């Protein structure tokens, strides 16, 4: 308070001489300003007078999309959902982010809790914590809005299985979700079972409704990967965390000391495009250009960005609606500029081969090669991740190496994702 009033006095003394005032009136105005400031500060709650100096970093994240064409698997009536995610980095305080971005009505969360998962839907003893929102046990999230929980003390190890439980009173449809979680989560029988160590499971889901981030306090920062199905881990083994970003998270834990370990945040959406939305598939999400602020810049602690998106633009191009190299370069340059403005380093990933896939053509392969040449040689990225070279068949570079092909000639299998995660270049933490 004393420092504030001293500063106010000094400011007033600098300002007031610029206007002709009598000494008495000058003293009166100065005293009035100081009294008003003192009254204002006295009326503020203690919490409002202090700054949160924590350094929050995302440890897990998913990009929301939707709504799904069939909403029935993601409709809840007075039930608890227990969502299972895996941390990348650890900490001793945690918080979560929820989203009702695509909802048309307010979303009521009656209660929320977090803990380490033991197995199945069970929470490990001694780790269950209640989450609050502005000090309250529940929160109503307006249509189109996100919500951030209050921090809670919880020792979260890196690479830990985490259970986030949300009680949804009333009837709720989940228009905001990540549709291809490749992870089993759980839906309870009727009622608030957020505090139950073992959930009374009615059914399971393989999506992450509403939950978009798990954050920890005190880590150095995060690598955000903006991508499509290859980032989302399409056709990898479910419930095994075999996405290439999971491999990268394990590498960072093994190869770096604690001060240089970065969170790894997967913002991939299967079917996602660089330049335009896919109106035929709502679960493919908004284009990378459209979702960049939400999924990259708003990620707590974002320090590095991997751009691994564009093959869906090429594969879905047509004679009536062609995509050109200039279009792709303009899109990449826009994302690079927006990342650099936020002091985020950008790693460009080349596009993987897809000969034999349903969307393949010779013309599209020519464009893919041109895009990859630009990514490798333009010098516009801080580093290049040559995913094409990792995954391609040396004997036929337009197709995936058979040992890495999941069978659809577009998406890798677990071995292919492992190879990607091991080949990803590591930049210095910054």
Regions found by a protein language model. Give the residues of each.
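Bacterial N-terminal signal peptides that target proteins for export
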Residues: 3-32
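Bacterial N-terminal signal peptides
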Residues: 31-40
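Active-site-proximal beta-strand/loop segments in catalytic clefts of secreted hydrolases
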Residues: 99, 167, 226-229, 267-270, ...
